[in-house]
Amino acid sequence: MNQFKKDFYKKISFEKDIIHNKNILSNKIYNQNILVIGGAGTIGSSYIKQILKYKPSKITVVDINENGLTELTRDLRSSNLLDYNPEYITYPVNLLSDTFDKIFNSELWQVVSNFSAHKHVRSEKDKISVEALIKNNVFGAIKLLNLCELNPPKYFFSVSTDKAANPVNIMGASKSLMEKLILSKKNKFRVSTARFANVAFSNGSLLDGFIYRLNKKQPLSCPSDIKRFFVTPEQSGQICLLATFLGETGNIFFPKLDFDKDQIYFKEIALDFLKENGFEPELVLSEQEAKKFDFGKCPTKYPIYFFQTDTSGEKNI
């Protein structure tokens, strides 16, 4: 499984920008007080790992996922990233709560980075879900920007998505509005954001789901007509790091990717995934057929169902 990830990541690797800007990043991050909201997720935790390399004096991580914060702490302590003994604090708190206000107003922050977001199109499946999405992506941003306006940080960053460009769904539209709200503050304090595509094997992603399905001996399914740009979890943190500290206020950062060469079909990844794990893909015609597959009779084969997308909420690239 890990080897498959390594081989997959080789296809989408980039490191030059971090190396080229190493001294600039060090000068801007060293000995700073940093607040990260939504830091227990895939992108937020990767960002924290990147930023700790430049030795801030203090880093405070806020996330509603208490288990995620626990795992982040274990991960950081098991590495050498906290060996220089920075002040490191975590709070299992919602950005929209009064408790968060107390945390924010308790001290001055040089860097405020926000990764708290609803990121999936499926988050708009009903009215309640849409309400939660808008509260998080839009009203959460408004609240955070208003707090920052009272006590401006040196750097404010909030992650966006490629779906914010010409949005075709509510999630993308909410992030597009979030971007506009952020840019409206560009003359009051330094603000930036970053758009990028799918983070490969991130929590809750389709590729991450492949691993769960395989471990549970459940069929795989994925769209046959959708291809995407991918970045690795590490690269997602690097992009956000660069966007936070480089460029001008009001900039929207995104990776330079080749439209023709760098997109990958989910179908191709699924087939490679099964082959790398020692299985021969067994193509089935329906979800029902996939569920009836007898793993005992065919131990070297694995059922996979490909379907054509039929929702206007998803872009085809």
PLM feature spans:
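N-terminal Rossmann NAD(P)H-binding glycine-rich loop of SDR-like oxidoreductase domains
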Residues: 34-54
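NAD(P)H-binding glycine-rich loop region in Rossmannoid oxidoreductase-like domains
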Residues: 50-61, 77, 84, 93-134
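Helix N-cap at the beta1-alpha1 junction of Rossmann-like dinucleotide-binding domains, i.e.
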Residues: 63-68
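Hydrophobic/aromatic anchor residues within beta-strands of the central parallel beta-sheet
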Residues: 90, 133, 156, 191-194
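Conserved Rossmann-fold NAD(P)-dependent oxidoreductase catalytic core, especially the SDR/UDP-sugar
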Residues: 114, 118-123, 127-135, 139-176, ...
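Mid/C-terminal beta-alpha module of Rossmann-like enzyme folds, strongest
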Residues: 246-317
